[in-house]
Amino acid sequence: MFQLESLKNKIIVIKYGGSIFHTLKNNKSFIEDLKTLKKCGANIIIIHGGGNEISKWLKKLQINNKFINGLRVTDSTTIEIVEMVLSGKINKQLVSTLSKEGINSIGLSGVDNNLLLCKKKYTFVNEIKKDLGYVGEIYKVNTDLLINIMNLGIIPIISPIGTDINGNRYNINADYAASSISSALNANRLIILTDVDGIYKNINDSSSLIENINLTSIKKYIKNGIVNNGMIPKLQCCSHSIEHGTKSVQLINGNRSHCIYNALFNKCGTKIVKGDDLKCQKAI
């Protein structure tokens, strides 16, 4: 039986999706859940997205949005806008909201102190290599920086902009960033907040929500087309995180009241584990 006291010194990584960012100011239960976790001694890291806000600003500036395999093509002009929105706007709004509520936090981007070292990422369409521009793939996380900050009782809030060894900045998919950070720290949980309740066998049937799933089942569901579109890269990130050190991953609806608290007790969303999906493994 899970108990809140077991959170002491455990690492909880939270990915706050851009699709739910507009609800943050009114989401008092999210703030309350963070306070509960901190009171229990948990070490928290938040990585945020911001795709909708980026698209809005690109449209304002009459810059075309182009995606390949769900990844935003990011040229030299677009990366400036992406960094401005993620690091300059959304990141600081998150920090401001938490600080106002008495939660100690600090805003960072992956550029700061080489937090997220990247190399250029490519994708393939029908086995043809496609250039995405300034889109990055993380190969190293500065875990010492994050651990030092958490040891001070401060929550790092991270914008998914990375850098290479030459100082070039890269746009990183926030799910991939959260997965990489979580696995590098061997986090006890990665909780991905999105705008759906979890993984469904049939997206049109609310009773088909999958509560627990293992890596083998994820691969089978993707192959058989049970999950598709934007859920595929999310599940691939979940699988990557589990395979590389994270104890468990949960995909939950960030618009639900006390979603973080309920996730800890496995009362919402879909939980991804390594072993038997019928016997949900104890992660904390």
Curated annotation (Swiss-Prot):
EC number(s) reported in the record: 2.7.2.8
Name of the molecule in the record: Acetylglutamate kinase
Protein encoded by which gene: argB
UniProt pathway annotation: Amino-acid biosynthesis; L-arginine biosynthesis; N(2)-acetyl-L-ornithine from L-glutamate: step 2/4
UniProt keyword DNA damage present: no
This protein's UniProt keywords: Amino-acid biosynthesis, Arginine biosynthesis, ATP-binding, Cytoplasm, Kinase, Nucleotide-binding, Transferase
Cell compartments where the protein resides: Cytoplasm
Gene Ontology CC, one term: cytoplasm
Keyword set includes Cell membrane: no
Family according to the record: Belongs to the acetylglutamate kinase family. ArgB subfamily.
Source organism of the structure: Clostridium novyi (strain NT)
Binding site for substrate: 50-51, 72, 171
A GO MF term: ATP binding
Role, per record: Catalyzes the ATP-dependent phosphorylation of N-acetyl-L-glutamate.
InterPro entries listed in its UniProt record: AceGlu_kinase-like_sf, AcgluKinase_fam, ArgB, Asp/Glu/Uridylate_kinase, Glu/AcGlu_kinase
One GO term of the biological process aspect: arginine biosynthetic process via ornithine
Catalytic reactions of this protein: N-acetyl-L-glutamate + ATP = N-acetyl-L-glutamyl 5-phosphate + ADP
Site (Transition state stabilizer): 15, 234
One Pfam family it belongs to: AA_kinase
